[in-house]
Each structure stands twice: as structure tokens, then as C-alpha cells.
């Protein structure tokens, strides 16, 4: 049965454009503001929402997203509350796809079966769990897919033709191509290499390919959108939110508008790629 993610990418393909996937950390800077931000992202033009599950040791994340996770944890955010926040979002938005992104430890502690049951119940559509390789698919990937959730994997510039089939084997929804080596928010992608990498991946799969890491401006989003099925932006949004907080890291009246303005610019950049094609 198709998920919201599957349907959204079908809609984007029919519209002839790439999608915008936005990342924010659940509970940053607090639960109520975080929920408002999710709705603001959709208003601004986000096609798919990635919601970070706060964790104390986020090894793939750069300083911006690490700091966002710490703010969320300090504000009392938990995995249970993250799932509750998705339920609250779904009360007003039944169509926008939501992906939970993070690390396996909080899910393991919560209990895999309990987590998947609750995730499905509240309206989560997919998972990105960056520290579970394909060799560990029985831990979470296969149970998640059996529960009706997409399991989205990452490929990187170092994923070669020998490794790629294993990465793709149980991936569903889309493949997330990491455009740079290293942590989130570090550096700028080499756009010529991104184009060839996406083409190489598409030779092995019919899945949509989303490209992220290092996308910070409307222009860079536009450039990536010329080559990918979706553009993923996280650190730039998290940074904009941080800059709108007060000196104690608390929400201000500027938070929602600041994020909404940036994402509207990113969405326009992505959409302009289709207009120029």
C-alpha cells in the first residue's frame, strides 16, 4: 500500500518538479514552538518533513543540529513526546509526509515494537536511522517495512558500485544521497559530481533520489533540484531558528516568521528549477 511519501513523489513527478524536504529538530526550542514550526514549513512550501529525534550523541550531525538537539533535550523533549507531537500535527494536517530521523539508541530503549506501533498510530510515514547499516536490517528496517513505514537509507560519495546494491536492497520511499563527505552543514557540494552521482544511482533503482547536506541557499537548492527528485535542507533552517532565539535559547515572536521566510525562499529556488528546465 503506498505511503504518503510514495504519493507525494508521484505528485511531484506529475508536476515535473523536484520536492523540498525540510529538517527540524523535534522540541527545538520547545515543544509548542516546534509544532508551530512544522505547520509553518508546510505553509512555506515544504513537500516532506523530516523531524529529528533528539539524542545525546548524534555522530553524523554538525554543530547546528547538535546544538538543536541539546536545546530540545534541555527543554524536556523525549522520543515519546516527539511521537505525541506528530499526533498533534496530524490533527490538522493529514497529507504532508513525515519522516523521523535520528539514531537507533532511543528507539531500542523505547522498544522496537512499541515504537513502530506508536509511530504508525500517530501518522509517521518513514524512518531514517543513520547508525543502522544494511547488515542490521532485521533490527528495525524489516520490522518497519512490515508495519507499513518507509525505511530510507543514505548513500554517500564513498558508496561504490559494490556497496550500493546492499544499500538499496530494503530501502523504500526514496534514497537520500549525502552530497558531501563528513557531517551535516559542512562544506558546499560539488554540483557536477552530484549530477553524475545521482545518474549513477538511478541506473540501479527506480526510487526517487533526494540530495542533502550543504544546501543552504535558494540558489544552491535550485541547482540541486535540476539533478535530483528532491532537495533536503536542514542545517540552514536550524541555524535560522537559532538566530531568532533570545540569549537564553528560548523562543521569541520572530521564530516562526524567520523560518517561514527562509523556507519560502528555498521552495521558490526548488520550483524555479522546473520552470527553467
From Swiss-Prot:
Location of the active site: 50 (proton acceptor), 61 (proton acceptor)
Cross-referenced PROSITE patterns: TRP_SYNTHASE_ALPHA
EC number(s) given by UniProt: 4.2.1.20
Catalytic activity: (1S,2R)-1-C-(indol-3-yl)glycerol 3-phosphate + L-serine = D-glyceraldehyde 3-phosphate + L-tryptophan + H2O
Pfam families for this protein: Trp_syntA
Pathway(s) the chain acts in: Amino-acid biosynthesis; L-tryptophan biosynthesis; L-tryptophan from chorismate: step 5/5
Example of a GO MF term: tryptophan synthase activity
InterPro entries: Aldolase_TIM (IPR013785), RibuloseP-bd_barrel (IPR011060), Trp_synthase_alpha_AS (IPR018204), Trp_synthase_suA (IPR002028)
Catalytic EC class: lyase
Protein keywords: Amino-acid biosynthesis, Aromatic amino acid biosynthesis, Lyase, Tryptophan biosynthesis
GO cellular component, one term: cytosol
Quaternary context: Tetramer of two alpha and two beta chains.
Annotated family: Belongs to the TrpA family.
HAMAP family recorded: Trp_synth_alpha
The protein's role, per its UniProt record: The alpha subunit is responsible for the aldol cleavage of indoleglycerol phosphate to indole and glyceraldehyde 3-phosphate.
Protein known as: Tryptophan synthase alpha chain
Lineage start: Bacteria, Pseudomonadati, Pseudomonadota, Alphaproteobacteria, Hyphomicrobiales
Originating gene: trpA
